[in-house]
Every structure is written in C-alpha cells, then in structure tokens.
C-alpha cells in the first residue's frame, strides 16, 4: 500500500527495490527555505544493513503489509530468541539484530507483540513497563530526601538507570522499556 513519506514512523516496514526495510527512525524536517523532507533511517531485514533515505514529504512510499500477533518469550540461545504463539503453540526464532537493545528487558513468559511479514519476524514491541530489582546502588544519605536528584543504580538485567534517593538494594522498581528510566516503586 502506498503512503506519503511524512506518515512513516519508527517500526513501519517499507518495501523498496524488492527488499523489505524496517524503519529505525523517521524525522520530518522543515527547513526555513525549500521543500520539507522526511529523513528515514532503515535496516534491511534480509541482511541487517542500515541505510538512510531522504524523501520529499509528499513522495509516495510502498508500506509492506505486516501482521502483528502476541507471542510469549521462551528463551535465548546462540541462534537468537525463541517465542511461542499462545494459541497455536508454534515457535518462532527471532534473530538477535531484530530484538536489538530491547533484549535486556525480555523476561521468561513475557507477552510481546511480534510483527511478521509472511513468516519473517521484522520487529518486536515489548510491554511499556517491566518490573526489575535493584542489585547495586549507593546507600541512602540522611538529609538527601528533599533533593530531586536521582542516584545511579544497576538493575537485575544489568541495565544502569537513575533512581530516587529512597530506593535501596533489593527494592523492586518499575522501569520504562523504551528508555530504561525509573517510573515507580513496584507495588508487589
């Protein structure tokens, strides 16, 4: 299906020159003079090569038909990440470059949305928030409760983030998967 370039967003799949590309980033640029353009960074699905394209915002781009389904994360091995369709129990192997940096937030039995073109996984969407445990952080300093500054912490998945001063080692916190930022203390 053809769409205008300015409507392309991160995660969309574009068909160009007979090959499929996943959009890594898309930005509409409106210079003071001249025609507005869409700067689109894409990753070729077949071999992972990244390219950058610039289109006029009114140019037509071929958007590939993608099917999104819920899958359950099972495990990781040297070949990639393995997911299961909870309805049919079919298993799908997703290459490591498709999962990318989101791999740190994958947890066993987590439900994720896999975008598939034919039978090929092209992108993955994790839940917006995950609950993790703080394994390393500085101790609470008395009198620091009034400041709004965050202190560094290492989470159970190895990711570093900033947490409020009252968070201690062993505390379970909710983290945003998009950027790894602290959201709140877990309520469990």
Swiss-Prot record:
Location (main, coarse): cytoplasm
Subcellular location(s): the record lists: Cytoplasm
Name the Gene Ontology molecular function terms of this record.
Answer: translation elongation factor activity
Would you say which domain of life the source belongs to?
Answer: Bacteria
Which pathway is this protein engaged in? Protein biosynthesis; polypeptide chain elongation
Which UniProt keywords are present, listed alphabetically?
Cytoplasm, Elongation factor, Protein biosynthesis
Q: Which residues form the signal peptide?
A: none
Pfam families in the record, alphabetically? EFP, EFP_N, Elong-fact-P_C
- Cellular component per GO? cytoplasm
Query: What GO terms describe the biological role, i.e. biological process, of this protein?
Result: peptide biosynthetic process
Record Gene3D superfamilies: 2.30.30.30, Nucleic acid-binding proteins (2.40.50.140)
InterPro entries in UniProt: Elong-fact-P_C (IPR015365), NA-bd_OB-fold (IPR012340), Rib_uL2_dom2 (IPR014722), Transl_elong_fac_P/YeiP (IPR020599), Transl_elong_KOW-like (IPR013185), Transl_elong_P/YeiP_cen (IPR001059), Transl_elong_P/YeiP_CS (IPR013852), Transl_elongation_fac_P (IPR011768)
Q: Which family does it belong to?
A: Belongs to the elongation factor P family.
* Role of this protein: Involved in peptide bond synthesis. Stimulates efficient translation and peptide-bond synthesis on native or reconstituted 70S ribosomes in vitro. Probably functions indirectly by altering the affinity of the ribosome for aminoacyl-tRNA, thus increasing their reactivity as acceptors for peptidyl transferase.
Designated name of the protein: Elongation factor P
Gene encoding the protein: efp
